[in-house]
Structures are given as C-alpha cells and as structure tokens.
Amino acid sequence: QLAARWLLNIGFITIGGYPDQVPEAYLIPPSAFESDESIPRFDNIAPHLGIDTFDLSGGAIADDFDNDGYLDLVESTWDPNGQMRFFRNNRDGTFTDQTQQAGLEGLLGGLNLVQADYDNDSYVDVLVLRGAWMGEHGQHPNSLLRNNGDGTFSDVTFDVGLGDEHYPTQTASWADYDNDGDLDLYVGNEWTASLQAPSQLFRNNNDGTFTDVAVNAGVTNERFTKAVIWGDYDDDRFPDLFVSNLGQ
C-alpha cells in the first residue's frame, strides 16, 4: 500500500495537482519530502524575463547570436507542428521574442538544437534536428539555419548539401575532424529493422557546402543512435568520435 500511495502522489506531482488534489486518505504530506539540510530552491523567473513558454520539450541554445556580448536564446519543441523561437537579450536581464523578425516563423519542430559557426563568418549558426523516436514517420528534414549577421537566419539545408536524405535523429556534433580549418558535422540517426537510417559524416568542402563521407570513413553506425560527441581523447590533435546507441 505504501508503494501505491507513493506512486499516486508522484502522479499528482507530475500533473501539478500535489498536494491539493490528492485524496486525503492517500496524501503523503509535503513534510515527508523535507530534508534535514537547508537546500536552496530555484525560483522560476522566466515570466519576468519574457521567456515563459509552454510546449513539448525540444532543444535549447544560449549563445551570443548577434555578437553584442550578451547571451540570446533559441528554443524548439518536439511537437512537429510547434514553432521554434528566438529570444534576443535586451542587455538588461530580459528578452524579446524576435522569432518573426529573425525569419524563423514557420520553422517547426526540433527535438534538439546544435550551434556552430560552420562558415567561419564569426556568427553562430543553428542546426535543428527532427524525427527522433518516430521511426518511419520521423523522416523529416533537418534544418541548417545560417546566421546572416543582421539579426536574421536563412534555411540553407538543401543549398549546402544536408537535405538529400531524411532520417530520424536527435543528435549531432560539430568538429574539424580533418584539421583543415572548418567545422565538419556528424549526425547520428536511428536505424531500425524497418527503417535503415545510417549515420552521416558531412565533410565541410571549405566553400560552405558539405559532402557525406560516412561510408568511406567507416562511421555509418547502423544502430539506433542516441548521442554523439567529438573529443581528442589521445591528444593527437585529431578529434575522435564517441557514439552512444540504444540497447548496445
């Protein structure tokens, strides 16, 4: 019975109904969750900063997109029909929603966001990843959003060679794996028996376009990829690739 009471209370916590909506006979009082130690609490200040949004959790980036020395915010949602948003830092601790002004209106979904200056123009660009967990229904194009340096972004996905294949993914990582001075991109895709979705290694061609060289590099990783990251673990100045797969 104690386990059932615990789960019932947790259920009400997840839907915001604890403790008021829990039947009195089954209520575990808030005092039971108190600690002997004084633990500081975080207050939700988002409403006061202009960034109070409610949606299915997606990706988030805090970076200086306009090079003014202040961190701006970009957020997305797992909802395929949900609008991603761009919040510009007002330099006073608050933010203004500049989604429409930035040219991002109509860009939907995105379970994850990964930023990088892929074209070496000193402005941070954004990669939007889509389709994860949706299997055959998750073959949505990702979006590479080029920062134009004037407060706007342009979707250049197909122009730069990233839009030829659409696989479900939620993970990618940037690094200059060939040490030629520009960033390359590894995208980890979700391979299943019903949907063959090899991971992709996009080599930067030094002209703002990319070529998928995963087959030649031996990194197609025909598995259900959940996370990828570059790092030079052996200090040879060449980035190495770590891939995490579901159930393997």
Q: What are the functions of these language-model segments?
A:
Residues Q1-Q248:
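Acidic, glycine/proline-rich Ca2+-coordinating loop motifs
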